A protein has these predicted regions:
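Terminal and domain-boundary accessory regions
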Residues: 1-168
């Protein structure tokens, strides 16, 4: 792909849980290269839940692979009591960048969660959406079936999986 200023936004828990459920693991270094080369993602934001001491190794791995880590804000009382739930943070960040970052071209979203449907539809209508990359076909929200393959892809498709899978 020619040089663009697309930006990727990854729902880290959705990516991890849905590839793991399918029996494979994403190599984050390969994945970051794939996003840059295939979709022109100059920046890639990796959203996770609250910061946890036990996940320091993961955080280093994500950053070393070239992702920008974004954590969910929680009050001290809520930490450890619920899932990451980064959906609202991702939507807010994407829409803020679409409005405020005049250099950003299009959005790449990595998630199969239907909570993003209205935003994806809106961004497609406004010609600001590149691709939804769902971790796997089987756990992707049925809402996305209305979009053509131009806008929706699956990371567990044979060719893509081969490019980004962690060698076992």
């Amino acid at each position: 792909m020619k040089e663009t200023n697309n930006q990727a936004f990854i729902d880290g828990q959705n990516l991890y849980m849905n590839t793991r459920a399918s029996g494979w693991t994403v190599d984050l270094v390969k994945f970051r290269i794939y996003l840059r080369e295939k979709y022109g993602a100059q920046k890639a934001y990796y959203f996770l839940g609250a910061v946890s001491e036990e996940n320091q190794g993961l955080y280093e791995l994500v950053q070393t692979a070239g992702f920008i880590l974004v954590f969910r804000e929680h009050s001290r009382a809520m930490i450890g009591k619920k899932k990451g739930n980064v959906d609202t943070d991702i939507v807010f960040t994407i829409m803020s960048k679409v409005i405020d970052d005049k250099d950003m071209k299009d959005v790449i979203l990595v998630s199969g969660d239907g909570d993003y449907f209205k935003m994806v539809k809106y961004l497609i209508e406004k010609k600001r959406f590149c691709k939804l990359l769902a971790p796997n076909r089987h756990s992707t929200s049925s809402l996305y079936r209305v979009f053509t393959p131009r806008y929706v892809g699956f990371l567990n498709d044979k060719d893509t999986k081969k490019k980004i899978s962690l060698a076992v």
